Each structure stands twice: as structure tokens, then as C-alpha cells.
């Protein structure tokens, strides 16, 4: 328990958007950052348990700040933070895939969204206890190194088939357009210019009748 509290306090001493906001509140209210953070986490947990729109709030927490931090990482000259947030998005994508198939079952658990939010916060926690980095190096990376050759081969075959299908569809469309143009051309060509010119004899006959 003491180790968890020490990690929590070390996190509050780091420089990021959350700690900057807590520092501003501490300066205005006189309440220490750790109490403000504990209160905010308690309110968040209660809302995720009993509040309306817990799913939306959980997805916002798991997406908005990481997206903001990812843009900052792209614009910064340091590439270490790029690796951190790329790792987070890999874990986030796999978690979303698993959640898609298990959501119908897990949705009915009362602590589902609170647990999901806690997991996402754990994955984006800066420092050596970053959950995304731990999951990547202990679970995802070993599986990837073991199966990446087969995955690359399957992806190459799928991309080749997709290109063949696209080429076949394009060829069929062009052939259909060519057949349609062939059917239209003889009908228009049958109306020769000679047939469209007025007959001089008929014109003269019409003038004599009027006289």
C-alpha cells in the first residue's frame, strides 16, 4: 500500500496537463494536490458506477488526452514519447477488439466501466509503471515476434487478392462502358446528313401552292 501511495505521489510531481491543473487548483484553494487528485478520482469512480453516460465518459477519458498527448509527441523533437503513445494505441486497439466481442457479457457487470476506465488510466500512466508498456513487452511483443511471419504472409495474400478483385471490377466496368458506346454509335450514324437536308423540289412545290 505504501508503494502504491509513493508511486501516486511521484506521479503528482511530474509535469503534465493533469498535474498542471491540480497545481493551479492547489494554488487557488490551498488544498494539497494529492487530496484534490484523490477526491477527483473518487468522484469519477462514483459517476462511472452510478452516473448516466458512463460509457461515453470512459471512452472520452481513454481517447481525448492520449490523442492530445500524441499530437504533442509528434511535434516534439524527442522520439521517446512517440514510442510511448504508439504503444498505448496498439494496446488500445487490441483492447477495443476484445471488448467488441465481450461487451455483451461484460456490459451487465456493475463495475465494468469503472474497471475499464481504471485500466485505460493504468495504460496511460507516465513513468516506469506505464501499463501499455508493461502489456506490450510482456504479452504483445512475444506473440508478435512468434507469429509476425505468418501474419505478414496472410496480409500479403489478402492485399494481392484485393488488388485482383479491384482490377477485375475495373475491367468489367470499362467493358460495359465500351459495349454501351458501341450500341449507341450505329443508331446515331444511321441518320446520315443527306437524310437531314431539305428536298429542293418539295420546297419549290410548296412555294407554287402558296402562289
Curated annotation (Swiss-Prot):
Residues 201-211 have a biased composition (Polar residues). Detected in retina. Its main location: endoplasmic reticulum. It is a multi-pass membrane protein. One of its GO terms (cellular component) is apical part of cell. Keywords: Cytoplasmic vesicle, Endoplasmic reticulum, Membrane, Transmembrane, Transmembrane helix. The chain crosses the membrane at residues 44-64, 89-109, 117-137. The keyword Membrane applies. InterPro entries: TB2_DP1_HVA22 (IPR004345). Residues 188-211 are annotated as: Disordered. Residues 188-197 have a biased composition (Low complexity). GO terms for biological process: detection of light stimulus involved in visual perception; regulation of intracellular transport. Pfam families: TB2_DP1_HVA22 (PF03134). Coiled coil: none annotated. It is found in: Endoplasmic reticulum membrane; Cytoplasmic vesicle, Clathrin-coated vesicle membrane. Interacts with STX3. Interacts with clathrin. Required for correct function and survival of retinal photoreceptors. Required for retinal development. In rod photoreceptors, facilitates stability and/or trafficking of guanylate cyclases and is required to maintain endoplasmic reticulum and mitochondrial homeostasis. May play a role in clathrin-coated intracellular vesicle trafficking of proteins from the endoplasmic reticulum to the retinal rod plasma membrane. Belongs to the DP1 family. This is Receptor expression-enhancing protein 6.
Amino acid at each position: 500500500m505504501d508503494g502504491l501511495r509513493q508511486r501516486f505521489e511521484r506521479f503528482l510531481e511530474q509535469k503534465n496537463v493533469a498535474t498542471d491543473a491540480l497545481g493551479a487548483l492547489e494554488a487557488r484553494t490551498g488544498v494539497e494536490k494529492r487530496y484534490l487528485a484523490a477526491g477527483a478520482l473518487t468522484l469519477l469512480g462514483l459517476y462511472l458506477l452510478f452516473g448516466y453516460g458512463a460509457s461515453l465518459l470512459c471512452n472520452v477519458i481513454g481517447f481525448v488526452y492520449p490523442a492530445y498527448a500524441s499530437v504533442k509527441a509528434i511535434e516534439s523533437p524527442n522520439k521517446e514519447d512517440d514510442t510511448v503513445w504508439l504503444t498505448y494505441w496498439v494496446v488500445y486497439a487490441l483492447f477495443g477488439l476484445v471488448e467488441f466481442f465481450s461487451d455483451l457479457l461484460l456490459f451487465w457487470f456493475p463495475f465494468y466501466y469503472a474497471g475499464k476506465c481504471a485500466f485505460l488510466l493504468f495504460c496511460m500512466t507516465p513513468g516506469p509503471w506505464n501499463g501499455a508498456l508493461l502489456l506490450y513487452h510482456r504479452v504483445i511483443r512475444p506473440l508478435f515476434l512468434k507469429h509476425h511471419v505468418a501474419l505478414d504472409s496472410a496480409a500479403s495474400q489478402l492485399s494481392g487478392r484485393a488488388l485482383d478483385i479491384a482490377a477485375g471490377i475495373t475491367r468489367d466496368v470499362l467493358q460495359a462502358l465500351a459495349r454501351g458506346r458501341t450500341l449507341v454509335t450505329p443508331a446515331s450514324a444511321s441518320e446520315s446528313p443527306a437524310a437531314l437536308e431539305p428536298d429542293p423540289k418539295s420546297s419549290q412545290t410548296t412555294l407554287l401552292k402558296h402562289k
